[in-house]
Amino acid sequence: MEYNYHKNAGQLAFIKFVKGLVHLLIRPKVEWKDESLKKSLKGKPVVFVCNHTHHFDGVVISSVLSRYKPYMLVKKSWYDKSGTGSFIRICRSIPVDFDTMDTNWYAQSEGAVKNGYSMLIFPEGGIAREGKMLPFKPGAALLAAKKGLDIIPIASLGEYKILFGKRQKILIGNPIKSEC
């Protein structure tokens, strides 16, 4: 399946608008383990992996990482919904079908990386409830190892609060080298 990685001006404007809303309403507090990574990652495709605690995670983490142009993997059932699916498709996303052995997500992810984009993957494959992480699916490690990409771990801590209350904390760790 051929995939168009070049977004039009309307889509880019929408992504910037969403980023502005996220920073205005949710006010994520981002902490880098190594501040120098902010510059060294620019223009370099990597695989960002993050825990998944809420439906907002994809939008919030993508907004925080927008300068690194991440494509996020999205469960196909969400991608296909009429309301949220349209929103998800406008943002940089690639559908993953958990119900079949479909590997289109991998081919599309390879294409995104080849075109200079990073990947944002929630390796749990779903939202973890009760503060306990789910077992990881192998996709993030597979893509990183096969393409020789660094893995950048991210921890999303706390609950989302709109406007008031404690800010969502996003911790971005040091790169993990991958080899195949």
Task: Give the residues covered by each predicted segment.
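Short, Lys/Arg-rich, polar N-terminal cytosolic tail immediately upstream
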Residues: 1-5
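Soluble catalytic domains of membrane acyltransferases
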Residues: 7, 11-15, 28-180
